[in-house]
Amino acid sequence: SSDGLHFVAAPSILGPSYFRVFLYAGWHYALVMPGSVHRSVDGIADFITGPTLFEPAMRHSAVRVVGDWLEVYWTRVGGNRGRIYRSMVDLCSDWMDWSVSDPTEILRPERDWEGAAEPLAPSLRGAANELVNQLRDPCILEDDGRTFLFYASGGESGIGLAELFG
């Protein structure tokens, strides 16, 4: 896009859906749902599939490189899991040997607009067309030395924003 408003799709298909790209050590990597890693020299073509780091229940993710670590903010399907988790990946080893840390819960519905008053129910793949007790779709924004996490609240009923520290 020349103006950030109008886009023309390139003919090549980069990879599966929910393709979260990050740069590290001269390579373009992508974390895709449900948790496999792909890489490419130029980030435009020839992404090859590498290891699967996450469980099949991984839904959406957001990624951020901090030094030699990849921070992954992610959600799950199934169970009563409408929460956002954070896991870390040490990027120092060969990418085919990467592994993910155990998840740490960082956010769950706390307010009515986030679905906190709704009953706990299994999170399903696909759209949530009514208010549910779930957070989804994390997205990271770094601006002026601050880091923010956007997320869909109440399933897909609103958008929340939290500042990340540390």
Write out the residue ranges for each language-model feature.
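Carbohydrate-active catalytic/glycan-binding domains of CAZyme proteins
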Residues: S1-G166
